[in-house]
Amino acid sequence: MIKINQIKLPVTHSDEALKKKIIKMLKLNAKTGFTYRILKKSLDARKKPELFYTYSVAVELDDTKNSEAAIVKRANCSSVLIYKEKEYRIPAHGNISLDRRPVIAGAGPAGLFCAYILAEAGFRPIVIERGSRVEKRTCDVQKFWESGILNPKSNVQFGEGGAGTFSDGKLNTSVKDPSGRNRLVLETFVRFGADPSILYDNKPHIGTDVLSEVIVNMRKFLVDKGVTFVFDTCVNNLDIVSQKLLSVYTDSDSNSNSEIKTDVCVLALGHSARDTFDMLYNKGFDMECKSFAVGFRVEHPQRMIDESQYGIQKKIILPPSPYKVTSNFPNGRGVYSFCMCPGGYVVNSSSTENHTVVNGMSYHDRNSKNANSAIIVSVSPKDFGADDALAGVRYQEKLETENYKRGNGLIPQQLFGDFCDDRLTTAYGDFSSCTKGNTVFAKLNGLMNADMEQSFKLGMEHFGHLIHGFDRKDAILSGMETRTSSPLRIKRDESFESNISGVYPCGEGAGYAGGITSAAIDGIKVAEAIIKKYRPDFK
């Protein structure tokens, strides 16, 4: 195949215009037959209001007699080159016999993709998920948003699909992976029902509504491959002798302290499994604090963001615009946007009684009237006194319990202008909030320390110079966003094992990922490490 980069066309272009551009760049005869596939598509707004789409495409000629090398040479363009797609391959089995099925704790993206690769290699893992399957989980979450009645075992954080199931469903990642794992993740989502556009969009997005369907289809496939799923069941203990795993113990409403004998356990816990973190710490796992960030969800009218980013009022051909903003200050604080949701909702994503935490969520169509993003301030171990590996967890809990008190269990909100003036908000400004979960006006001042709060205000002011209106007085703040990433890391060696033989920390909760795709990739890497070491010899 031939790859062409940097094909630039107006956003209003037709499919025929793209085809003509390919013919021109390859200097082909108009009668030469070929097919093409879009590899990457991104919006170029650097000359707004003139907007362009930039493409990379893979071209295959109908007539194999035409030499691709000769065509590339004739094109005489650095954007035209020979292309060979990287095909992902599962590694060969190792030599150590594994006669007991591996256990995966957690059915988020890390756990699901670890199970997917292990199943394809014949390992038939047992997946233990503390929350419910996605069909029941969706009902539990909706009930919580409508009534405020929380199910601590099945909520926005816990359940099949992980926390990302109730998010924007962004699939972009900064992970550079030459082995084809990133492509495999996207292709797998498409295989189970996602829009094929995620394979080439520069900022792929699946949406919480579509992602739920994809997860169900993926689970059904894995069950057919011999994977066992156990829902509403928590891994509550590990039997460890001489630094080696012997058994996993689980707890559920119907069966407490049930034993599963195994030599391999993947800890794909997610970032909110605080009781499990406690258990692992007390069991002697090597763990450490790590930096993370906290802040508030900030809402603006989506139309305002579109006009700033596109330079024109958005037309029907353009999707709701995302944004990404960052700043750094002399005090060492970074302030930046996180999990930006165009056309999205602020959601109550609490998972613990008497704690309130928020996140952002979008459906596939991104059709709400507001844009929202977490605007967060960096937190380092020095902010919470890192006397042990769980200090960051305790800091999160402190913020969430105080946040709960401010809103009396509802999402506390304050307009940015009132936040700056340390004043209680009494009414929305020119636009109202788009939320899933009930809200109340409350003061958010003092939740963060003075240095962090000042950094947040300065960050908002700076972002107002980048996006007109970002620091408008009626921007809506919702408190608090505390679970941007895991506050700890469970250490592992080059073979992905912890200091306990047979236990593999994995994904976001273990401190090795940040988002759906990077967590899925880490799950694949851990599965590969297990496959390279063992061969399945169980019945």
Predicted regions and their residues:
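Residues forming the flavin
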Residues: 1-53, 57-166, 170-539
